[in-house]
Amino acid sequence: AYYRRYLPYFQRVKQLINSGSIGRVMNVQIRFAVPPSDLDHSRKDQPWRVQANIAGGGYFYDLAPHQIDLIQEMFGPIIEATGYTSNRGGYYQPEDTLSACFQFNGGLPGSGSWCFVAHESAREDSIEITGDKGKLKFSVFTYEPIILQNSQGRQEFNEANPRHVQLPLIQSIVDHLRGENVCNCDSISATPVNWVMDRILGKT
């Protein structure tokens, strides 16, 4: 599921951060909001993603891992996390609205908000990185243009996905098996994501 790490879009985000285009990173914010789907309104045929006995939780369990994995890939492991959860819409049993705050091992603070029962006007898919010399904004699922703002003005970057989005990760694994490179996307690197999510949900 963490193939996004290797996509050109997110590689460009990392390159912009590492190049110092926004200076020293001061804060990370995840914001995600979508309206409920038509199936969410059905009591009889609810999506498996909101059946806790199958998915373990709601849409947060399905979507947030991608976001959390990316920011940990960029800034290191999160060592503290806490969250507040609620079911505001009442369409299904698991939580549908969450707020969280967390801290990376280097002291960098961050926060996140997720709402899966928002009005269409509130729809959002963004991660904003604030630095002392600028800011960077990008999406995780919609691949909106990457926006860089600093003293040089505003720039937008468009990075097209390969036809098969898992291909860059697969290539990295093949290169690893052939001894040509090291693929860091393994179960060990993925485990901290589950820990962060459990902390946000108050399960640990």
What positions do the PLM features span?
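Predominantly a Rossmann-like dinucleotide-binding segment in NAD(P)-dependent oxidoreductases
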Residues: 4-84, 88-91
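A general structural signal for well-ordered alpha-helical segments in protein cores
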Residues: 9-10, 67-68, 166-171, 194-198
